[in-house]
């Protein structure tokens, strides 16, 4: 897949955490295999870029972006935005990829039944590890699950089943009225 990206030069790179984790694994293994001085320089650059990301959300760095262009070129060198969703992803992986590819990564929450439109992080939000607020096309609420002792009134962190409603929510399962009735309350 990475070889295809280098040839196709996409501007937008949506993916799932599983693929991002594989990319992370290959990149970190590649860095670890570099000779000492090269590995030191890459790690110094990563540290500087991580500091800038944590300080003010910048994913670029004037001194180190030339070095990291080799990583960008793995995806064709033209990617301006990456997105992820469908499963949780480790903050460490997201921050590493933001710094290596010098692009923001938007993390989202949604379901097939919501056309993925649950919530997304803001492109300018430097904080990783959350999926942002609700999108404009959806309402989100927590439904109490007393049998599991999950209550929306739990402090400090409310818990419950996440329920979505809005125009982006599907109308039902094709020829599966039983499953449709089960999905809506």
Which residue stretches match the model-derived regions?
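Conserved AMP-binding/adenylate-forming
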Residues: 13, 66-185
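A short beta-to-alpha transition loop/helix N-cap that caps and shapes the active-site region
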Residues: 2, 22-23, 116-117
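Conserved P-loop NTPase motor core
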Residues: 1-3, 106
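Alpha-helical "lid/cap" subdomains adjacent to substrate-binding clefts that gate access
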Residues: 8-81
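A short local structural element in Rossmann-fold oxidoreductases
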Residues: 6, 24-25, 94, 174
């Amino acid at each position: 897949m990475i070889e295809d990206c280098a040839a196709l030069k996409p501007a937008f790179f949506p993916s799932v955490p599983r693929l991002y984790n594989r990319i992370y694994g290959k990149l970190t293994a590649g860095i670890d295999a570099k000779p000492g001085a090269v590995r030191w320089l890459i790690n110094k650059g990563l540290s500087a870029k991580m500091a800038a990301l944590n300080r003010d959300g910048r994913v670029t760095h004037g001194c180190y972006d030339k070095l990291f262009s080799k990583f960008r070129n793995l995806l064709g060198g033209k990617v301006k935005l990456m997105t992820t969703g469908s499963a949780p992803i480790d903050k460490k992986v997201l921050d590493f990829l933001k710094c290596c590819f010098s692009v923001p990564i938007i993390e989202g929450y949604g379901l097939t039944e919501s056309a993925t439109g649950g919530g997304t992080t803001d492109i300018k939000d430097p904080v990783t590890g959350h999926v942002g607020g609700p999108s404009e096309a959806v309402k989100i609420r927590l439904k109490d699950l007393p049998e599991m002792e999950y209550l929306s009134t739990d402090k400090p962190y409310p818990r419950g089943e996440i329920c979505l409603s809005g125009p982006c929510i599907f109308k039902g399962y094709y020829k599966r009225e039983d499953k449709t009735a089960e999905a809506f309350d």
